[in-house]
Amino acid sequence: MGCCTGRCTLIFICTLQMLVALERQIFDFLGYQWAPILGNFLHIIVVILGLFGTIQYRPRYIVAYTIWTAFWVAWNVFIICFYLEVGGLSKDTDLMTFNISIHRSWWREHGPGCVWRLVPAPPSKNLGDHSFISVTGCIIEFQYIEVIHSAVQILLSLIGFVYACYVISVITDEEDSCRHK
């Protein structure tokens, strides 16, 4: 491959995807969001695989990355629907924590401009050591921050998909031309 523009761009996109996924992973860990943590972990592994395939001219690894991007886009569309409460989904359920805790998005209490204070729990609720928290003054609501994260992931995945298909095409064309010589 004399000109590496496609490969170099795919390497850049994969690196950017890795950085964005690591940032998202940190905030999902802070919020104990186990489903996104698992998804981000798998995504990071597959992006590393795609990066390796791109650097080492291994089209099968790039194909695996390409297939994964379709699943990753679907997962992020689900997250957008979840936080925007589309189709009967509710951001107030414990779905993202696999129903094992009452934690929510870290951004719910720590978003830009958010001020939170503890509110006494009603006597009818037995929350153990948990308490109610009142959050006010947020510049942007937490669900929109989560939607922006997912939208960025979708955008990077779609761009990565296009470049991965291009790089696969170029690599296989080069392999075919080498076989016919």
UniProtKB/Swiss-Prot annotation:
How does the protein's chain sit in the membrane according to the entry? Multi-pass membrane protein
User: In which compartments does the protein localize?
Assistant: Cell membrane
| Transmembrane parts of this sequence | 5-22, 35-55, 62-82, 151-171
Q: Name one GO cellular component term.
A: plasma membrane
Quaternary structure note? Interacts with atp1b1 C-terminus.
Q: Which family does it belong to?
A: Belongs to the NKAIN family.
Identify this protein by name.
Answer: Sodium/potassium-transporting ATPase subunit beta-1-interacting protein 3
**What organism does the record attribute this protein to?**
Xenopus tropicalis (Western clawed frog)
From the broadest rank down, the organism's phylogenetic lineage runs: Eukaryota, Metazoa, Chordata, Craniata, Vertebrata
